[in-house]
Regions:
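C-terminal soluble interaction/assembly domains
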Residues: 237, 242-301
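Active-site neighborhoods of enzymes that stabilize oxyanions during catalysis
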Residues: 21, 25-27, 34, 53, ...
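Sec/Tat signal peptide C-region and signal peptidase I cleavage site
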Residues: 16-20
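N-terminal carbohydrate-binding/catalytic regions of secreted carbohydrate-active enzymes
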Residues: 39, 43-92
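Structural recognition of the beta-strand scaffold that forms the well-ordered cores
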Residues: 42-45, 61-65, 99-104, 132-133, ...
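Sec-dependent N-terminal signal peptides
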Residues: 5-14
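Helix-loop module immediately N-terminal to the HCX5R catalytic loop
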Residues: 71-101, 216-250
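Thiolate-centered catalytic microenvironments shared by cysteine-dependent enzyme domains
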Residues: 83-174, 197, 259-281
Length: 302
């Protein structure tokens, strides 16, 4: 149970910090409306600079995108930048060490949703847990008739300091060693998990032996106006079906780290805190030719 203890102990060091403004993991539009003018609140939009500039945004927000936080490693895996580089990027967004942070996505595509949840996990990884994701994103904000603006503020570098909680990440080699001892959740679509189909970027069909499936797409919706958004459940379907205790240690994987991080955010908001994200995920797992099952089912269906 060593890994479980590491996670809980590390997180408690951060959860015990006191903040003047405390952000819930899943932020309601009512909460954000009430606290919008608070000087200790920082708001980050995940979209692109053109959309942020010309299609309005939540007042006081700054903009970033998913690709700002990841790079292609030498083996072709997409992974987070090193801790200090991530911290510098956060400071450049004007984030201070004691800021309450709300992240939202525009929802022009599902990548923006994944980017928002990935950034949420990165804040946790860097030791800043006073952060939340706006439930239903920009779509929800417009539906609630929240304030919007077109002006962009001048950004002054913030004072953010990383206090890394690296136990919130699990590396590929460690995952292979410990996967039989913990609940391993794969966030890919059901047909990918079943070994029937795959993303083009994935070199192999199949799944990690013993893993369970909770597709992040289960919680994605598209509004008539074209915006995508995530509808957070009270309890994720898989965890409800398996009757998973909130204290149980859970390992999260996907094809890439953004799908893993999406489930991290959804699970965390539902009260599951003993979580570790596989950032390099199945891209690296399959490059290293580590064990899979259901690798030939796609051939049987042709």
């Amino acid at each position: 149970m060593k890994y479980r203890i590491i996670i809980i102990t590390a997180c408690l060091l951060v959860f015990n910090q006191s903040f003047a403004l405390s952000v819930p993991p899943s932020v309601s539009t009512q909460w954000l409306k009430k606290n919008l003018k608070n000087t200790e609140l920082a708001i980050i939009e995940v979209s692109d600079k053109v959309d942020f500039t010309f299609n309005n945004h939540i007042p006081g927000s700054v903009v970033t995108n998913k690709s700002d936080w990841r790079y292609e490693d030498s083996d072709g895996s997409l992974v987070r930048y090193p801790v200090e580089k991530l911290a510098e990027k956060i400071r450049r967004l004007g984030i201070n060490d004691n800021d309450a942070v709300v992240i939202y996505y525009k929802g022009n595509n599902t990548d923006e949703i994944l980017g928002a949840f990935y950034l949420y996990w990165l804040f946790h990884l860097l030791g800043h847990t006073n952060v939340g994701v706006l439930n239903e994103g920009w779509h929800g904000w417009l539906e609630a008739k929240g304030e919007i603006e077109s002006d962009s503020k001048t950004i002054q570098a913030g004072s953010f300091v990383a206090q890394p909680l690296l136990a919130l990440e699990v590396k590929t080699d460690e995952l292979n060693k410990i996967r039989n001892h913990y609940l391993l959740v794969d966030g890919r679509p059901a047909t990918h998990f079943q070994g029937l189909t795959k993303f083009e970027a994935n070199p192999r069909y199949g799944r990690i032996p013993g893993s369970f499936n909770q597709p992040w797409q289960d919680y994605i919706r598209k509004e008539k106006n074209g915006y995508w958004y995530a509808k957070a459940p009270k309890i994720p379907k898989l965890l409800a079906r398996l009757k998973v205790d909130p204290d149980r240690a859970i390992l999260l994987t996907c094809l890439g780290g953004t799908g893993s991080a999406f489930n991290y955010g959804i699970f965390y908001a539902a009260g599951y805190r003993n979580l570790r994200v596989d950032d390099a995920a199945l891209r690296r797992w399959n490059i290293r030719r580590l064990p899979l099952e259901n690798t030939n089912l796609n051939k049987l269906n042709k």
